[in-house]
Swiss-Prot record:
Entry keyword Iron-sulfur: no
Source species of the chain: Homo sapiens
Membrane topology, as annotated: Single-pass membrane protein
GO terms (BP aspect): mitochondrial respiratory chain complex I assembly
Main location: mitochondrion
Protein name: FAD-dependent oxidoreductase domain-containing protein 1
Subunit structure of this chain's protein: Associates with components of the mitochondrial respiratory chain complex I.
Disease: Mitochondrial complex I deficiency, nuclear type 19: A form of mitochondrial complex I deficiency, the most common biochemical signature of mitochondrial disorders, a group of highly heterogeneous conditions characterized by defective oxidative phosphorylation, which collectively affects 1 in 5-10000 live births. Clinical disorders have variable severity, ranging from lethal neonatal disease to adult-onset neurodegenerative disorders.
EC numbers: 1.-.-.-
Length: 486
């Protein structure tokens, strides 16, 4: 396929001819012709790269009903449910734009892969309960003909949350809500905790909650690849590139109290191709912002937050990249194979990794300790000073641990209330959000994808009401408080 692709600032690209076009009684193999011409030019100009003609078969289509910005688990989940819920096969054309198909800096692949239902908000509990069902039946949802079944390597060891005296009442209240929503969670006194987990030091622990079903951890990379494989089989298109611009129309409106607002509708997405100064315009009806830690930049391209401060028009998407470290250590005398993911009163956490006496964990920094998110370099002193002392206090065997490796990843951190943003923007009427989950987006992705697809296709949330997660709460100042974010 040859398509004229335009540098920034020029008009639309044109599709000139499809491969195999019949002409004069024979078939023209255009991809083959391009390859042949490139070889000839290279032979004439040895040692020089050939950019005179570009094979553009990797380009996005000129039109897509839905453009999803971000090809991580959240974006792929939205794509999956859009195709799953469409009225007939092929009714909706979906394009996923991902700037890095290696996912080297994507939050999904750098996650510790945990799933639990021990939240304080009913919506978060419901989302994680559905995700547990989705993961448990993964091959019913994501099976592809003639492809091997998925093995998420789910470890159902549960989550163990520890509370100090001042947080014990809140933990009891949270567990009551969790049980009402159907989660299987038990409360444990310090004595019960010592009996079940003799390796733990209960100093400073007044109460613990323990997830007995559908909690643990899984392979996030396997889920990502399984979703990608499935949506491709359903006809979802992919493009490696970066969204650099939206072309929109505007309409000035008056509210019921006679305040002027400007409604925008995106008509075209400009996708800058990988390692190129060229872009491809894509006409669309809907844009899904699932760009994770960089979703605020995508929102700003659409004009979100451009108005006067204190107005709905001037309300920005409060999501930014926050760097989080994960450390892996070895400790032969450490807790055994049935060790849950432990969340300490200090904020430190850990779990086992495999069968070889290895563990991984970390701790979210305070606001004053937040590292520079410009790169993914690891601060090993943070472990020595801020993580290890808490681990060694809670599990005395960890006094002799030896750090083996470490990595860093990004949270799509919602600075407003650390909860997700789901659904349409009130003024950019065809931009929908699936972002800002501040570390629990992976485990809730199946439910979030379904909710966004419902809103796009049906105009409302149908299975789980996620109205508290709408963008308008930022303008109204209505924080939703989730007490259990690790």
């Amino acid at each position: 396929m040859i398509r004229r692709v335009l540098p920034h600032g020029m008009g639309r690209g044109l599709l000139t001819r499809r491969p195999g076009t019949r002409r004069g009684g024979f078939s023209l193999d255009w991809d083959g012709k391009v390859s042949e011409i490139k070889k000839k030019i290279k032979s004439i100009l040895p040692g020089r790269s050939c950019d005179l003609l570009q094979d553009t078969s990797h380009l996005p289509p000129e039109h897509s009903d839905v453009v999803i910005v971000g090809g991580g688990v959240l974006g792929l989940s939205v794509a999956y449910w859009l195709k799953k819920l469409e009225s007939r096969r092929g009714a909706i054309r979906v394009l996923v734009v991902e700037r890095d198909h290696t996912y080297s800096q994507a939050s999904t692949g750098l996650s510790v892969g945990g799933i639990c239902q021990q939240f304080s908000l009913p919506e978060n509990i419901q989302l994680s309960l559905f995700s547990a069902s989705f993961l448990r039946n993964i091959n019913e949802y994501l099976a592809v003909v003639d492809a091997p079944p998925l093995d998420l390597r789910f470890n159902p060891s549960g989550y163990l949350l520890l509370a100090s005296e001042k947080d014990a009442a809140a933990m009891e209240s949270n567990v009551k809500v969790q049980r009402q929503e159907g989660a299987k969670v038990s409360l444990m006194s310090p004595d019960q905790l010592r009996n079940k987990f003799p390796w733990i030091n209960t100093e400073g622990v007044a109460l613990a909650s323990y997830g007995m079903e559908d909690e643990g951890w899984f392979d996030p990379w396997c889920l990502l690849q399984g979703l990608r494989r499935k949506v491709q089989s359903l006809g979802v298109l992919f493009c490696q590139g970066e969204v650099t611009r939206f072309v929109s129309s505007s309409q000035r409106m008056l509210t019921t109290d006679d305040k002027a607002v400007v409604l925008k509708r995106i008509h075209e997405v400009h996708v800058k191709m990988d390692r190129s100064l060229e872009y491809q315009p894509v006409e669309c009806a809907i844009v899904i912002n699932a760009a994770g830690a960089w979703s605020a930049q995508i929102a700003a391209l659409a004009g979100v937050g451009e108005g006067p401060p204190g107005t709905l028009q001037g309300t920005k998407l409060p999501v930014e990249p926050r760097k989080r470290y994960v450390y892996v250590w070895h400790c032969p005398q450490g807790p055994g194979l049935e060790t849950p993911l432990v969340a300490d009163t200090s904020g430190a956490y850990f779990r086992r990794e495999g069968l070889g006496s290895n563990y991984l964990g970390g701790r979210s920094p305070t606001e004053q300790e937040e590292p520079d998110p410009a790169n993914l370099e690891v601060d090993h002193d943070f472990f020595q000073d801020k993580v290890w002392p808490h681990l060694a206090l809670r599990v005395p065997a960890f006094e002799t641990l030896k750090v083996q490796s470490a990595w860093a990843g990004y949270y799509d951190y919602n600075t407003f209330d650390q909860n997700g943003v789901v659904g349409p923007h009130p003024l950019v009427v065809n931009m929908y959000f699936a972002t800002g989950f501040s570390g629990h987006g992976l485990q809730q992705a199946p439910g979030i994808g379904r909710a966004v697809a419902e809103m796009v296709l049906k105009g409302r949330f149908q299975t789980i009401d996620l109205s508290p997660f709408l963008f308008t709460r930022f303008y109204l100042g209505e924080k939703i408080q989730e007490n259990n974010i690790i």
